[in-house]
Structure formats: structure tokens, C-alpha cells
Curated annotation (Swiss-Prot):
It holds the Pfam family Rota_Capsid_VP6. One of its GO terms (molecular function) is host cell surface receptor binding. Residues 62-73 are annotated as: Interaction with the inner capsid protein VP2. Gene3D superfamilies: 2.60.120.170, Viral capsid alpha domain. The VP6 trimer contains a zinc ion located at the center of the molecule. The zinc ion is not essential for either trimerization or transcription activity of the DLP. Zinc-depleted VP6 has an increased sensitivity to proteases. This is Intermediate capsid protein VP6. InterPro entries: Capsid_hemagglutn, Rotavirus_A/C_VP6, Virus_capsid_a-hlx_vir. It is found in: Virion. GO terms for cellular component: viral envelope; viral intermediate capsid. Keywords: Calcium, Capsid protein, Intermediate capsid protein, Metal-binding, Ubl conjugation, Virion, Zinc. Its main location: virion.
Length: 397
């Protein structure tokens, strides 16, 4: 993997910097590195493809070295270099796609394609120029079963989940009380509602709670907490739990009271915040518990009193909600990230070449299914293909 990264980094620099008119002295170190790459690769043969619709291609390396000059690089020099650069880039692209297309239930962190296995040989270690990539560093740690740490801006750690629970219901569905939520990616929105606006609740207060377990622990997380759940702020028709009917939800939004968010790790509370909105920090957690209250307003203007009558029918439904967004966090497991294109790159390659469903990844790389059942085998394979996708993205946009 390190060799693949070094090849790609060298080729990217060569493509960007070996241009007509450049002083040779400005790129002499790069050209020496480029020539070392050619010397190491010359005389070797590789084969890529042969899975799905990814065609089999054979690669041979027999290229001349780039010379020295005291002057600027001229058109002939650059054209000669370009021919070599483009062939190498095409080779790297196909090695990456071949690797992305493959998966294994055992030792999925290791190279799976014939070409990358060959590049992992001792004879190619002379190409190991630069391993400054975060993904390369973490691939090495994961490969040695040591602790890794990935910094994500918005970790897609929450499988999609959208549902409701009713704490009070009737066959007519005309006086309901409960919670509804949507969890996806890095955001949680939860709403508590009571058609009667806590009319008969103790002290006219309804208590709500929403617990969200994560598939992997996060550390040093920056989180935004807001006293609103905008996705539940408009009327909608909802299918009943048994699917036999539908019920009407017509929210009127109140501000939640006594809001508390707890971050837990292995059942132990690590951080607790009460009535604090905006930016909050969580040190280490694998579960989030949100609790909040709906308090019936003790004093109402006539207009508000008309919204929340003392007896049915209840046309408007008192609702309070919270939004929690994980803006950034460190995770020891590889995850899709809203600010990166690695999952999209991997999925598009597998779709474009009709890669058959294997023993590890779900059909279509369905992220919700993948993260819901996030096994060590999936984590290893995802670490490998994301690392390869990050290398490929250096050359192929």
C-alpha cells in the first residue's frame, strides 16, 4: 500500500511540475525520484482486472530514464516524460479499481488483487518515498492491529432510522402522546408530542427520552445541540404501527424544558449537559441519551388557549424537539464522511463495472446496512478500499 501511495504521489508531482519552460534545477530532485521509480518498475509485468466487467489488462514496464539539462525543460523533454507518466497513471488507476472491486472475509485489510500483492514485495520497497497520508498511516496501524485514529468532520456513524413510539394511544388516534425521531449520518432529530398538551399529566409536564447507541465509540467530539426539530415542525399523515390505518400529526412548536444530554461509554456517564445549547463537547462515548420535557404553559393568551383546549377535539398538537449534530469527532474505526468522496468513489467503481456481490459488503454498498452490521471483516475491507480510493483520488478526479 505504501508503494502504491508513493507511486501516485510521484506521478501527481511529475504531472503537475514537469512542464515546458520549468528550470531543470527546480525539479531535479523530483526527476531523480521519478527515475528511481522507472528503474524499480522496469522489467516487471502485472495483470489487472478480470472481475465483473473490469477488463483484464497486462502491463509491462520498459521505459527510458529522464535526462539532465542545464536549461529549461523543452517540449521534447516534456513530451517524453508525459508518455511515461500517462502509462503509469493508467496502471495505477487500474490497480486501484481492481483492488476496490475485491473483498475477503479473512484478513480483508491485506491487498486482495494480484497486482497490489506483487507491489507489496520487497523488491519495490525502493519506491517507498512518502507515507505522509493519514489513510496510509492508519492502514498500517490497522494492519498491525494497533489503535488507529481517524479525524472526521461529519462521521456517518448513525444508520438511517425514522420511526415513532406512542406512550398513549386509542383506536381513533385522536389523543396521542409519544416521540418520533429520525437518525441519519451524523444528525439526530427527536420530537416529543402530546395532543392534549400535558393536560392530565402530573404537574402538566410530559417527560420524553431518546437513547441512541453508536456502532463505534467516538472521542473529542464537537457537537451542536439545538432546542428544535425542524423535520417535525409541519403537518403530516403517519402510518399506524400495525399498518391498518393512518393518523394526523399537526404540530404546534413549544420550547423544550429541562433538556439534558448524556454521553455514555460502556454504560457509564462521561459528560452531561443540562439546558445548554449551541456547541458542546463530548470526550468519549458510544451512546447518546437525550431527555426533555413538554410543559403546558401556565399562562396563555386567548389565541394560545384556543390551540390547547381543556377537552377534545385536539386539533393542534403540542410538540417539543431537539436536534443534535456531530460536527467532528475522532473515531478508531474507518467511517464514511460527509466531507469526503471515498464511499462514493468506491461505490461508483463497483457499480460501473458490475462487480458481483461478495461475502462482505452489502449490495450497492448500502451504508445503512453496512454500518448497522459493522463487523470486523467489514471494517478491515473498508479500511483497505478507502485507503486505495484516497490514493486513486490523487490522480483520478
Amino acid at each position: 500500500m505504501e508503494v502504491l501511495y508513493s507511486l501516485s504521489k510521484t506521478l501527481k508531482d511529475a504531472r503537475d511540475k514537469i512542464v515546458e519552460g520549468t528550470l531543470y534545477s527546480n525539479v531535479s530532485d523530483l526527476i531523480q525520484q521519478f527515475n528511481q521509480m522507472i528503474v524499480t518498475m522496469n522489467g516487471n509485468e502485472f495483470q489487472t482486472g478480470g472481475i465483473g466487467n473490469l477488463p483484464i489488462r497486462n502491463w509491462t514496464f520498459d521505459f527510458g530514464l529522464l535526462g539532465t539539462t542545464l536549461l529549461n525543460l523543452d517540449a521534447n523533454y516534456v513530451e517524453n516524460a508525459r508518455t511515461t507518466i500517462e502509462y503509469f497513471i493508467d496502471f495505477i488507476d487500474n490497480v486501484c479499481m481492481d483492488e476496490i472491486a475485491r473483498e475477503s472475509q479473512r484478513n480483508g485489510i491485506a491487498p486482495q488483487s494480484e497486482a497490489l500483492r506483487k507491489l507489496s514485495g520487497i523488491k519495490f520497497k525502493r519506491i517507498n518515498f512518502d507515507n505522509s497520508s493519514d489513510y496510509i498511516e492508519n492502514w498500517n496501524l490497522q494492519n498491525r492491529r494497533q489503535r488507529t485514529g481517524f479525524v472526521f468532520h461529519k462521521p456517518n456513524i448513525l444508520p438511517y432510522s425514522a420511526s415513532f413510539t406512542l406512550n398513549r394511544s386509542q383506536p381513533a388516534h385522536d389523543n396521542l402522546m409519544g416521540t418520533m425521531w429520525i437518525n441519519a449520518g451524523s444528525e439526530i432529530q427527536v420530537a416529543g408530542f402530546d395532543y392534549s398538551c400535558a393536560l392530565n399529566a402530573p404537574a402538566n409536564i410530559q417527560q420524553f427520552e431518546h437513547v441512541v447507541p453508536l456502532r463505534r465509540a467516538l472521542t473529542t467530539a464537537t457537537i451542536t445541540l439545538l432546542p428544535d426539530a425542524e423535520r417535525f415542525s409541519f403537518p403530516r399523515v403517519i402510518n399506524s404501527a400495525d399498518g391498518t390505518t393512518t393518523w394526523y400529526f399537526n404540530p404546534v412548536i413549544l420550547r423544550p424544558s429541562n433538556v439534558e444530554v448524556e454521553f455514555l461509554l460502556n454504560g457509564q456517564i462521561i459528560n452531561t449537559y443540562q439546558a445548554r445549547f449551541g456547541t458542546i463537547i463530548a470526550r468519549n462515548f458510544d451512546t447518546i441519551r437525550l431527555s426533555f420535557q413538554l410543559v403546558r404553559p401556565p399562562n396563555m393568551t386567548p389565541a394560545v388557549a384556543n390551540l390547547f383546549p381543556q377537552a377534545p377535539p385536539f386539533i393542534f398538537h403540542a410538540t417539543v424537539g431537539l436536534t443534535l449534530r456531530i460536527e467532528s469527532a475522532v473515531c478508531e474505526s474507518v467511517l464514511a464522511d460527509a466531507s469526503e468522496t471515498l464511499l462514493a468513489n468506491v461505490t461508483s467503481v463497483r457499480q460501473e463495472y458490475a462487480i458481483p456481490v461478495g461475502p462482505v459488503f452489502p449490495p450497492g454498498m448500502n451504508w445503512t446496512e453496512l454500518i448497522t452490521n459493522y463487523s470486523p471483516s467489514r471494517e478491515d475491507n473498508l479500511q483497505r478500499v478507502f485507503t486505495v480510493a484516497s490514493i486513486r483520488s490523487m490522480l483520478i478526479k
